Amino acid sequence: MGREAEHFSAGNKRIIIPYHGWNICLLVCYDLRFPVWSRNVKNEYDLLIYVANWPIPRHLAWDALLRARALENQCYVCGVNRTGMDGYHLKYNGGSKIYSAFGEEIASLPDEQEGIATTSLQLGALNRLREKFPVWKDADEFHL
């Protein structure tokens, strides 16, 4: 779709990085469309970060899928998207956002604006949600 195959090859394992008590899962662009790839089995990670190039025609899917990944994986989700025009004349409006595990948008940048959005993520609040509503215990395990 975005000609990723010309520059990237499919991975065979997820990258989860421990950082100051957090486990962070790093994914790219098109991975957002595949929920099994981001499945948070046994709460392996707390923060899911997507770095992406989603053009304006797909901005509704971008927003909906980021929120869905936060809800289904009981984690924070940060989606970082580009702005401007690419060499194929596709226009990008940004739409970078951070969602809580409740699916609430907790930080964002206005469309068409480059910049940095900041917020405080609370690991304790995330762990309390997971203890109170442990849906991950009932989830099917998928192996890729």
Residue locations for each model-derived region?
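Active-site catalytic loop in hydrolytic enzyme cores
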Residues: M1-N43, P57-A64, R128-V135
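Glycine-rich, small/acidic residue-mixed loop/short-helix segments
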Residues: T119
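C-terminal/domain-edge helix-coil "capping" segments
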Residues: F133-L144
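CN hydrolase (nitrilase-like) catalytic-core segments centered on the catalytic cysteine
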Residues: R33-I116
